Amino acid sequence: MLLKSTTRHIRLYTAEIKNSELVPSDNVLTLDVDPDNEFNWGEDSLQKVYRKFDELVESYSGQDLTDYNLRRIGSDLEHFIRSLLQKGDISYNLQSRVLNYSMGLPKVESPETEGKYR
């Protein structure tokens, strides 16, 4: 049975991709990061998300893969992405289809605010 967890920037499926289709799997999790391209990603930042995903999956090792556990992993990854944005590791993609600033308004340094919001 296909389980999924969908947040704004993370989609997790208990499935593998075959011929561009999701095929349910009891052994494979498929991760889709930022499907709407809301952020600008460097390879390092994307790898941080993948490592965090691996760490979270490992933390559930030996437990049943339930809808609840999958949603917790997705939620934890969503919070991790927020932390990357706050640290400046990623930024909003101003060429995105929709600019909704779902993780908060961008912070732009000015001489008056320099260093105050770190």
From Swiss-Prot:
**GO MF assignments:** oxidoreductase activity, acting on NAD(P)H, quinone or similar compound as acceptor; quinone binding
Recorded topology in the membrane: Peripheral membrane protein
Give the E.C. number(s): 7.1.1.-
Question: Which cysteine pairs are joined by S-S bonds?
Answer: none
Tell me the compartments it is located in. Cellular thylakoid membrane
**Organism domain of life:** Bacteria
Q: Which EC class does it fall in?
A: translocase
Q: Which GO terms describe its cellular component?
A: plasma membrane-derived thylakoid membrane
Q: Which residues form a coiled coil?
A: none
Q: Which UniProt keywords apply?
A: Membrane, NAD, NADP, Plastoquinone, Quinone, Thylakoid, Translocase, Transport
Record's catalysed reaction(s): a plastoquinone + NADH + (n+1) H(+)(in) = a plastoquinol + NAD(+) + n H(+)(out); a plastoquinone + NADPH + (n+1) H(+)(in) = a plastoquinol + NADP(+) + n H(+)(out)
What biological function has been recorded for the protein in this entry?
A: NDH-1 shuttles electrons from an unknown electron donor, via FMN and iron-sulfur (Fe-S) centers, to quinones in the respiratory and/or the photosynthetic chain. The immediate electron acceptor for the enzyme in this species is believed to be plastoquinone. Couples the redox reaction to proton translocation, and thus conserves the redox energy in a proton gradient. Cyanobacterial NDH-1 also plays a role in inorganic carbon-concentration.
How it assembles, according to the record, is: NDH-1 can be composed of about 15 different subunits; different subcomplexes with different compositions have been identified which probably have different functions.
UniProt similarity note: Belongs to the complex I NdhM subunit family.
- The protein's name: NAD(P)H-quinone oxidoreductase subunit M
Q: Which organism is it from?
A: Rippkaea orientalis (strain PCC 8801 / RF-1) (Cyanothece sp. (strain PCC 8801))
Name of the encoding gene: ndhM
